[in-house]
């Protein structure tokens, strides 16, 4: 499947953008999303995730990943049915990637891929904050996709 995944690395961040693209595409393929879906992913800093978390969720604290799904209900724009489907944007804190990789005892690459998978699943409607059953469903799907990527839990 062919998807459009735009990865933006903020200044000074040396994350593996190809891994991010691969991880996002793996989720979209595993979830059988139609070709042409679009996702934007920004790898940024703790400070920026803190600001976004505060401004958009009302939580005055840094976090590792945020997803901003496009619900498709913006009536200002009309999109032809044959146009690509824009799913939304994800922001990932690279500082959290490094810290959590060390904390959990795995590679920064695995953590970066995991947060990407987690964020894309949120764009597709998965939400671990909706209770234990949904959290378990999301975690299972994350691990299935991480295995597909060759980055299973160590």
UniProtKB/Swiss-Prot annotation:
Family matches, as Gene3D superfamilies: Metalloproteases ('zincins'), catalytic domain
Predominant location: cytoplasm
Binding site residues for Zn(2+): 118, 122, 128
Enzyme Commission code: 3.1.-.-
Annotated GO MF terms: metalloendopeptidase activity; RNA endonuclease activity; zinc ion binding
GO BP terms: rRNA processing
Keywords: Cytoplasm, Endonuclease, Hydrolase, Metal-binding, Nuclease, Ribosome biogenesis, rRNA processing, Zinc
Enzyme category, top tier: hydrolase
Cofactor, free-text remark: Binds 1 zinc ion.
Cofactor: Zn(2+)
Subcellular localization: Cytoplasm
Entry keyword annotation includes Phosphoprotein: no
Role: Single strand-specific metallo-endoribonuclease involved in late-stage 70S ribosome quality control and in maturation of the 3' terminus of the 16S rRNA.
Similarity comment: family membership: Belongs to the endoribonuclease YbeY family.
UniProt-recorded name of the protein: Endoribonuclease YbeY
Organism, scientific name: Chloroflexus aurantiacus (strain ATCC 29366 / DSM 635 / J-10-fl)
